[in-house]
Each structure stands twice: as structure tokens, then as C-alpha cells.
């Protein structure tokens, strides 16, 4: 490098440093040297060599091959070579040197938190899951209620509607039936209606809407308000005979068994609040649920108890 090139280089550094108010090396790097010492190219070369040593000490084996930079020259080495050959990029010297400092700090942090990689393996649950019965109770009947929100003339409905009967001496409601879904409705003069016989929640709602539509066609301003499932009945078979006498003696506070009056044992579960009818043959009927999940939960609770009283 001749004298003219060195002079132009020194002039370039002077202009760059003088034009930036936050270009302070001493505060950023903890150096005690003067500004003239920073302008010396040999001092910048020694700084680059120190950063190179820090980078070479890093263990980058955890990175993929395409991201590993151990076999490639670092950015500091490239800039050092460019400075020695008198070649400079269009970026200001401040941004280039600040990027070098950030790279060095990032490399040091990576070295501190570098942990060996281990293969991922599925973890076994700490608490074993209780054995499932494998039996799913089937819904047999759903009872729902709805408010038609208008007074009704039951005699007029019974005379005009098909499949409807009304005997006020026996029961103060119109009994109406439809085939699809196969259900029965009890329609009261207050506008309240009870729908029973559906096998699912969707069928119960559909049937209730059909009954409300029939009442509308008969000239009443019927609405469809406050539909609610009031009771669900499910049943299943455990496929083994049960000693009901032993069961009632062990669970006296929850169960009652009087074979002279009713052949099944009545078991009143507290949580969920379900009533179970248990028969010697292994048939079980569950009633009193508002949601089908309560039926499933109640059966899973009673199944281990029934296995304990299985007839040999």
C-alpha cells in the first residue's frame, strides 16, 4: 500500500467517525485507548483476530451441516482481508463493526448454553389409566321439554290433528305421536310440551320441532322456547351373572333390593347423580342423566364393583 492509499484510508476513517455521534468504541468494547488508536488499521486487525479465536472455540456440532460455519471463513476474517487489501464495501464502517460485535456476543452466549442433543422418545404416563370396561351403554329413551309460549285449546287440537288423543278424565294433556322420529308428545293447555321416546339428543329436538309445527298449522301462535333435555335412559349388559344379595349387603347406603317387589337392585350413585337398576342376569339400566357423558361415567364407576360380585 503506497502513501496516497494510506492517506485516503486515514481520511475515510476520520470522516466516518466524525460524522456519527454514537460511534463510541471505548464504551462498547471496554477499551481504554484513544481515538487515534482506534483509527489504526493494525489495531482493528488485532480485534478481528481476537473475535476469530472466540469463534473458533465454539462447539457448533449441534448445527446441521448447511448451517455450520466452522469450515468457512468468518465474517470478521473476510472483512480483515478486505481491509488489508484496501477493498471496502458500500456499507458505513459503523454498521460493519457493530455487526461484528453482535456476532461475537451471540457466539459467546451460544457457547454458554450449548447442550448435547438427545433423541426424542415417547414418555410413559406416570399414573396408569384405569382399565376400561369396553362396554358402551346404549341410549334407549330421552325425555325433553319445550315451551310453546301460548295457551292451547286441547279439545280443538285433538279433533283436528292426526294421531292425537285427549281424555281429560284420565290425563290433562293431549297425547300425540309421530313415526319419524318415533316419539310421543304430551301437550298441555299452558303451552308446555314433553317429548319422549327419542334415541338421541338430535332426534329429541327434531321431534319437538315437528310437534310445534303441527300446533302452528292448527292456528296457534306456537313458538319454540327453552328446549331442554330432562332425562336420559341407557342400558347395557355386562355378560355375567351378579350376586345381588352380596352387593346390597356391602353397599347398603347406596342400594336397595327387595326381590318380592322388584327383581332388580336399585343403586343410587352420588357422583354422577344416576340411578342404576341392576339385574341378576347382568343387565344394567341407567337413568336420571342430563348428558350422555354422565351415563358413561356412572357405568365405568359401577363396572369394577359388579365384577367383584360376579357369580362363579
Curated annotation (Swiss-Prot):
Q: Where is the composition biased (Polar residues)?
A: 94-115
Matches recorded under Pfam families: TBP
Q: Where in the cell is it found?
A: Nucleus
**Ranges of biased composition (kind: Basic and acidic residues):** 75-84
- UniProtKB keywords: Developmental protein, DNA-binding, Nucleus, Transcription, Transcription regulation
Q: Kindly report the protein's main subcellular placement as a broad class.
A: nucleus
Q: Name one GO cellular component term.
A: nucleus
Q: In which tissues is it expressed?
A: In adults, expressed in the gonads, with expression much higher in the ovary than the testis (at protein level). Shows a small amount of expression in other adult organs, including the brain and kidney. Embryonic expression is mostly ubiquitous except in early gastrula embryos where expression is asymmetric.
List the Gene Ontology MF annotations in alphabetical order.
Answer: DNA binding; RNA polymerase II general transcription initiation factor activity
- Span list, region Disordered: 65-115
Would I find DNA-binding among this entry's keywords?
Answer: yes
Q: Tell me, what does this protein do in biology?
A: TATA box-binding transcription factor. Members of the TBP family are differentially required to regulate transcription and development during early embryogenesis. Commits mesoderm to the hematopoietic lineage during hemopoiesis, acting via mespa. Binds to the mespa promoter.
PANTHER family with a match to the protein in the record: TATA-BOX BINDING PROTEIN (PTHR10126)
The family line of this record is: Belongs to the TBP family.
* Name used for this protein in its record: TATA box-binding protein-like 2
Source species: Danio rerio
Q: What is the lineage of its organism?
A: Eukaryota, Metazoa, Chordata, Craniata, Vertebrata
Amino acid at each position: 500500500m503506497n502513501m496516497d492509499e494510506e492517506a485516503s484510508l486515514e481520511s475515510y476513517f476520520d470522516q466516518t467517525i466524525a460524522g456519527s455521534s454514537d460511534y463510541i468504541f471505548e464504551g462498547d468494547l471496554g477499551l481504554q485507548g484513544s481515538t487515534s488508536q482506534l483509527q489504526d488499521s493494525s489495531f482493528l486487525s488485532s480485534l478481528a483476530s481476537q473475535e476469530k479465536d472466540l469463534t473458533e472455540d465454539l462447539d457448533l456440532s449441534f448445527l446441521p451441516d448447511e448451517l455450520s460455519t466452522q469450515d468457512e471463513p468468518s465474517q470478521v476474517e473476510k472483512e480483515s482481508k478486505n481491509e488489508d487489501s484496501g477493498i471496502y464495501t458500500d456499507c458505513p464502517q459503523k454498521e460493519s463493526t457493530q455487526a461484528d460485535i453482535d456476532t461475537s456476543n451471540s457466539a459467546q452466549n451460544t457457547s454458554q448454553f450449548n447442550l448435547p442433543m438427545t433423541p426424542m422418545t415417547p414418555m410413559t404416563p406416570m399414573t396408569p389409566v384405569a382399565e376400561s370396561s369396553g362396554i358402551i351403554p346404549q341410549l334407549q329413551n330421552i325425555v325433553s321439554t319445550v315451551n310453546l309460549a301460548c295457551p292451547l285449546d286441547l279439545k280443538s287440537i285433538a279433533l283436528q290433528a292426526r294421531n292425537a288423543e285427549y281424555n281429560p278424565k284420565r290425563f290433562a294433556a293431549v297425547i300425540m305421536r309421530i313415526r319419524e322420529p318415533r316419539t310421543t308428545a304430551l301437550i298441555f293447555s299452558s303451552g308446555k310440551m314433553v317429548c319422549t321416546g327419542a334415541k338421541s339428543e338430535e332426534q329429541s329436538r327434531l321431534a319437538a320441532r315437528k310437534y310445534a309445527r303441527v300446533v302452528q298449522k292448527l292456528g296457534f301462535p306456537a313458538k319454540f322456547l327453552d328446549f331442554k333435555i330432562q332425562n336420559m335412559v341407557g342400558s347395557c349388559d355386562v355378560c355375567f351373572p351378579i350376586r345381588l344379595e352380596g352387593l346390597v349387603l356391602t353397599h347398603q347406603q347406596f342400594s336397595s333390593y327387595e326381590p318380592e317387589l322388584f327383581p332388580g337392585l336399585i343403586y343410587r350413585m352420588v357422583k354422577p347423580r344416576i340411578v342404576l337398576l341392576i339385574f341378576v342376569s347382568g343387565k344394567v339400566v341407567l337413568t336420571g342423566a342430563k348428558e350422555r357423558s354422565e351415563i358413561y361415567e356412572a357405568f365405568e364407576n359401577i363396572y369394577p364393583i359388579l365384577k367383584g360380585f360376579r357369580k362363579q
